[in-house]
C-alpha cells in the first residue's frame, strides 16, 4: 500500500512539474472556448490541442457539442478521424443512413466526403477530431432543425 501511495504521489508531482516546465504541454481536459454560432445550431466548445506546422501535418481539436446541437453539412480536403470520448451523437455521410456515435467509437471520414456530426438530442458529445494541414473546412449545406429532428426519430426507438 505504501508503494502505491508513493507511486501516485510521484506521478502527480511529475505531471505538475511537466506542466510548469519548458515542454509544450496542454490538456484535452480543458473545455476550450465557446465557438461562434457559425455553421451549426446549438452550443459548441472547441479546444485546439495541436496545430499543423512544418513538422506536424495534422491538427487535433477537442469538440464538445451540448445536447441538441449540430454542425452543417461539410467536407474536408483531407481524411478526418473522429474519436468519441464522451456522450452520444449522430454522424452521417451524404447518401448514407445516419448512425449513432458513442464514447469509444472511431470514425474515419475520407477526404472530400460530405458529412455532418453532432450531439444527440438527449446527450452532449465530446470527440477528438484529427484532420490534415491548413486546408479549411468546406461548408456545403445548412443542416436544418427539422432534418436533425427526423434523424433523432429514426435513431431513437
Per-range role (PLM):
Residues 77-90, 94-95:
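Glycine- and acidic-residue-biased ligand/ion/polar-headgroup-sensing regions
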Amino acid at each position: 500500500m505504501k508503494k502505491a501511495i508513493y507511486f501516485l504521489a510521484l506521478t502527480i508531482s511529475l505531471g505538475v512539474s511537466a506542466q510548469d516546465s519548458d515542454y509544450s504541454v496542454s490538456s484535452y481536459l480543458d473545455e476550450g472556448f465557446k465557438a461562434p454560432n457559425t455553421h451549426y445550431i446549438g452550443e459548441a466548445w472547441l479546444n485546439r490541442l495541436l496545430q499543423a506546422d512544418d513538422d506536424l501535418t495534422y491538427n487535433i481539436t477537442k469538440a464538445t457539442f451540448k445536447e441538441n446541437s449540430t454542425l452543417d453539412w461539410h467536407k474536408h480536403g483531407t481524411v478526418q478521424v473522429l474519436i468519441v470520448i464522451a456522450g452520444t451523437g449522430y454522424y452521417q455521410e451524404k447518401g448514407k443512413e445516419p448512425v449513432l456515435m458513442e464514447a469509444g467509437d472511431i470514425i474515419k471520414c475520407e477526404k472530400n466526403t460530405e458529412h455532418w456530426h453532432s450531439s444527440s438530442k438527449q446527450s452532449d458529445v465530446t470527440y477528438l477530431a484529427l484532420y490534415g494541414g491548413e486546408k479549411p473546412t468546406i461548408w456545403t449545406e445548412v443542416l436544418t432543425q427539422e432534418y436533425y429532428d427526423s434523424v433523432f426519430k429514426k435513431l431513437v426507438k
